[in-house]
Regions:
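N-terminal intrinsically disordered, low-complexity tails
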Residues: 1-23
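Long, contiguous alpha-helical segments
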Residues: 22-141
Length: 141
């Protein structure tokens, strides 16, 4: 690792409390505005640990080409997928012992699923890389 970077002092408890109150008020005004524009819209889903894990899962799967429309070529970001999977692993490591059984099972299942998808994708990429190049049709170079 490189040299330690000196970080600024964290905000005081009072500053954090004021900032959180302002954030909550601003979020509520935004929600009220959206509901006024679209009265039939339901409330957004609650922000939970499961929603956070699901967000990482969806990101990793999309980065590995899932959700591609039929007939379109998948857009794969294998390095981005690996980074997202590594973030999930860090989340699992840093929250170990602090999750409910349900949260832990979900996180472990998601990690298993995205790692398996990653292994399948990298296996396919390796197989393609090992195949000899297709020669051009006669008369083309």
């Amino acid at each position: 690792m490189g040299p330690e970077v000196e970080l600024p002092a964290p905000p005081s408890a009072e500053e954090s409390t004021k900032q959180k109150a302002a954030y909550d008020a601003s979020s509520q005004r935004l929600e009220d505005l959206i509901r006024a524009q679209n009265p039939g819209a339901g409330a957004p889903p609650p922000v939970t640990f499961e929603a956070l894990v699901q967000q990482f899962y969806i990101s990793a799967m999309i980065q590995m080409g899932a959700g591609t429309q039929e007939g379109q070529r998948p857009r794969v970001d294998i390095l981005g997928a690996r980074n997202t999977i590594d973030l999930l692993a860090i989340l699992a490591e840093k929250t170990k012992g602090n999750l409910t059984d349900s949260e832990d099972r979900m996180l472990q299942s998601v990690l298993f699923d995205v790692r398996m998808a990653f292994l399948e994708l990298t296996s396919m990429i390796n197989m393609q890389a090992m195949q000899p190049p297709v020669p051009p049709p006669p008369g083309k170079k």
